[in-house]
A protein has these predicted regions:
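N-terminal subdomain of nucleotide-sugar transferases
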Residues: 1-41
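Structural motif
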Residues: 6, 10, 37, 92-93, 96-97, 120
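Conserved nucleotide-sugar phosphate-binding/catalytic loop shared by glycosyltransferases and other
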Residues: 32-74, 81
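Short, well-structured alpha-helical segments in soluble
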Residues: 79-89
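An aromatic- and histidine-rich active-site surface loop
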Residues: 95-112
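A short, histidine- and acid-enriched strand-loop-helix "catalytic/donor-clamping" loop
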Residues: 117-132
């Protein structure tokens, strides 16, 4: 069954949920019909247990159960699943968060289906120069 949404949000990791929470809350308060997709990129229960309760957000509408193999296989899996989902779940806008594999895969699927992509990074920086992944 086909359904049109005002927006689709795709998340895959705990930091994505943290970044998506304020937007999801805003969409719900303003009755913006949103499809909320969790790719399942992080399967570790400690990374996702209680996240919905902690952030006071609803659980995702769809869980893709992405395999925990390597990044290439994850990307291919997510692109394939989202391409199929986007055939029956339409929206002009797809939102992605952060810079994880799920973000890349959702961007590819969004482009494949000629939908508009928006990206939220949210500028999270610790300014701790000992964290090698965050150097500016």
């Amino acid at each position: 069954m086909k359904k049109n949404y005002d927006a689709i949000l795709v998340v895959g990791t705990r930091p994505n949920f943290i970044k998506a929470a304020p937007l999801l809350e805003y969409f719900e308060e303003n009755k913006i019909d949103t499809l909320f997709i969790h790719t399942g990129q992080h399967k570790d229960k400690s990374m996702s247990s209680n996240i919905f309760e902690d952030l006071n957000i609803r659980e995702p509408d769809i869980y893709l159960d992405t395999p925990t193999t390597n990044m290439n296989k994850q990307t291919t899996y997510i692109v394939d699943k989202l391409d199929t989902l986007f055939d029956t779940n339409k929206s002009k806008y797809v939102g992605v968060f952060g810079d994880v594999t799920s973000t890349l895969a959702a961007a590819i699927s969004t482009k494949n289906k000629k939908m508009e992509l928006f990206h939220v990074e949210s500028g999270l920086r610790s300014r701790n120069m000992d964290l090698s992944l965050i150097h500016i």
